[in-house]
Design a protein with these regions (language model features):
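Soluble non-transmembrane domains of integral membrane proteins
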Residues: 1-148
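Hydrophobic alpha-helical transmembrane segments
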Residues: 121, 145-151, 169-176
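Generic secondary-structure transition motif, activating predominantly at the C-termini of alpha-helices
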Residues: 139-141, 156, 168
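Juxtamembrane membrane-water interface segments that cap and precede transmembrane helices
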Residues: 150-159
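Core alpha-helical transmembrane segments of integral membrane proteins
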Residues: 159-182
């Protein structure tokens, strides 16, 4: 093909803290769920570590689900730590949606030197160098909705094909303007 497409391979680590509610203590079947909108690039999910225990993640359509059991003695108001990792392959961009119920921090580090930060929420800190970039978003439930997203688009700045096309279009424009003005 004459066109190059930007693809990425990423290792995603998700961790956090979930407060236990009175309703979840009483319920027998508690589920931990997360959604991946484009499942094609998703691979190698780890087990979910939840409250010091490990649980298998299983796929249900676009969601991954684990039936979880609270640690002995857990009560409403306690906070449970969770973590899991997976590999994600994709093209052109990587976006995240913040949690509606708490604070969300997303940190991205890459060796790609041409990021374009996109979405309703821009990074709080970012550092772009010739050998890559780092960016961090910190979002609270007060300044986001479930529809806000944040992420990065991997831009290919003016490759030779784009430059040739641009030159041809501007050349035609100048020729047309000369004839119209004359």
């Amino acid at each position: 093909s004459i066109y190059d497409v930007i693809v990425y391979n990423s290792k995603v680590k998700i961790s956090g803290k979930l407060p236990i509610t009175e309703k979840s203590v009483v319920a027998r079947d508690n589920e931990f769920r997360f959604k991946v909108t484009d499942i094609k690039g998703f691979s190698n999910p780890s087990q979910l570590t939840f409250g010091g225990q490990t649980f298998e993640l299983r796929r249900q359509s676009e969601e991954f689900v684990a039936n979880v059991v609270f640690p002995k003695g857990a009560k409403a108001g306690d906070v449970i730590d969770f973590a899991f990792t997976f590999d994600l392959k994709g093209t052109e961009s990587l976006f995240f949606n913040p949690s509606r119920d708490g604070n969300t921090t997303v940190a991205i580090s890459s060796s790609y030197p041409h990021p374009s930060f996109q979405g309703a929420l821009l990074p709080n800190t970012r550092e772009v160098k010739d050998d890559g970039f780092n960016a961090t978003w910190s979002v609270s439930s007060f300044n986001s909705s479930s529809y806000d997203d944040m992420g990065v688009k991997f831009v290919d700045p003016a490759n030779p094909y784009q430059q040739s096309m641009r030159s041809a279009k501007y050349g035609m424009l100048i020729i047309i303007l000369v004839f119209v003005a004359g």
